[in-house]
């Protein structure tokens, strides 16, 4: 755009500069806003700019001064770099297949060092402690610093990625493997950022509800620019902006590279991210250039240097740091004669030393200082770095991510660059280096962390114990529903409604719903508990005149997450780990369509297990034939199998309200009172039926996974054992009647709330027997239940056959028939669907007769008679294939 009146332009610029000098930024911002409003009202199209020039956000004149000893910190940082490099390389000399990553921490060492020295607050009696999500691939640097601090031994460094024999270090941050060290698993890309957002949000929730003091703690999340392509990385940033989470700080290490090559070779990832975060109402702080550029910026009165910086793309910036100073002079400054003139007095070596912001401790400190003091918005720091910084041959190369070895020449260059006291003769031995106890370095490290409350990272393993009310509190569920038909979903809501009334446990219950509360009949809780809102309720709800109106409250207990399963699961993890992060044990109940649980957020569920989260996941509207009208995408027949892949997830598929009550009470006791590092997955259904009273002595079997529900004591020539769970157990009960009435066959009915728990028990017993030859073999719980029982065993569930197949090896009878709902779901009545998937009462009878015929107890013609009697089509299509 041509400047038609330069004099007038300069007058406007001078006026703005005068306002900035005399009245400050706020006044200037106000005036520019008013001018923008005037221009908009007059119909003038305003310049569109969601990004700022490619330079540091904080001017030199506004930088907070770093108070520490720069030279001592560089010395310590260099030792951390060396030990991180040595640890990875020594591990790979031991076993080349162990792997490891050098370049990520090499690019982010300064980002972490400034945090450790000045900002990461450890938990104390006065401060709850900051929550830090460390970038997974940077773990070697965190270990290396802990080694210098005396927290990790040389033997442990030697055992990096060698954990089986004990005293090793996990590859990445894993609380399950290092429960007193790592707080959060982060190496599955994208899960760290979304969890950090919801941890910060849950921190505000706890503050609003009076569980923790307000305003002290911060959540730091370190991530890579390439990681931002994961939907989970940026998918929830609008929530952080909307909720004004000023306790949240993202530090994005913009080394411009991902594993295979540039993140945005043909564009600028920092500018792209700036626009995205500014649009989501974040405070954006770019740290692009180091202090050695400041004199050049001071010379750039015409703005040509800035113009050149703005036009160069990331692929070129990567190239500059993969080459040398002469290349930078020719290809960056050589674009304009004026720029070459600007650097004519600089040698190629001095040009090469023009540093990037993420490697400059002064610039990083200023950015962090601004971030922790900023109010009303979350902050993102976009720090430009070099991948593989200091590693020589791998620096800024596309191969940098996978570099695990460095040649001797590069090692020597690394040593010299960072002043590591290792002799040439010892270089290939890659010795760890640790200053002596009492040295200046050791004292400085200890002093910096003492000023911040102690060492980091650190994880609390246990918190206060909260008593759980006795089972009798849920007596209404234990006594049955009388003549009234209700679903187990309704029973669940009643159980929660009762538990929240408990003085001790009640306030710690966190109901979480992804915009499905009305589906599950939970809208009554809106008024009772309130929906958490950081601003309360600024409007009058449309249903205010109703009993169950939509009530939002700053102290609300319910987390209503909207149509957002990943966010809801992240909230659940935040609540489920609160015992560790805040010393406040909370008991989250996240209820969702079971099909949109593990299948949708399986990676987060795995992270929950790694995080040692406590709580209940409630798979609502479960069962492939029970949620009958919704069809293929909604009908769940495999969530229990998915849940079974997580070692510390306990899963149950109860049929009756009393089973559900027993399971929830026992799970609460295990997780809240005993603080076992497990979580529960329970499926509940939307089919209404009469809920019977609990049979005497059923509690233990419910928890173990199996108990005798109905025993047929009448005389019969033949007998079978029928197993079932969920709503299909009721079909099994009806099948037992048909077997008796139509064929004179006796049938015992077993409720099996958890085939997964039966498998867990069976595997444990099998392993014990294998390891104790010569001793009396133990029996699995399945063998204890079915041993000595007459006849074949038939199992039927609303899930894939594999669910019940899991216990086959422990079933005493050779004849074990399994029915299940393999195949895609579809819409129809429950009766038709159960016939289609071959799990209804008639198919249970058919399977029982087939098993008896297989053993020779009855003639095959009896099976044929049953097929004819019940109108079963022998030529019907296999539901697995249609």
UniProtKB/Swiss-Prot annotation:
Entry EC number(s): 1.2.4.1
Quote one Gene Ontology molecular function term.
Answer: pyruvate dehydrogenase (acetyl-transferring) activity
Gene3D superfamilies referenced in this protein's UniProt entry, alphabetically: 3.40.50.920, 3.40.50.970
Family matches, as Pfam families: PDH_E1_M, Transketolase_C_1, Transketolase_N
Reaction catalysed by this enzyme:
N(6)-[(R)-lipoyl]-L-lysyl-[protein] + pyruvate + H(+) = N(6)-[(R)-S(8)-acetyldihydrolipoyl]-L-lysyl-[protein] + CO2
| Quaternary structure and partners | Homodimer. Part of the PDH complex, consisting of multiple copies of pyruvate dehydrogenase (E1), dihydrolipoamide acetyltransferase (E2) and lipoamide dehydrogenase (E3).
Q: What does this protein do?
A: Component of the pyruvate dehydrogenase (PDH) complex, that catalyzes the overall conversion of pyruvate to acetyl-CoA and CO(2).
Q: What is this protein called?
A: Pyruvate dehydrogenase E1 component
Gene name as annotated: aceE
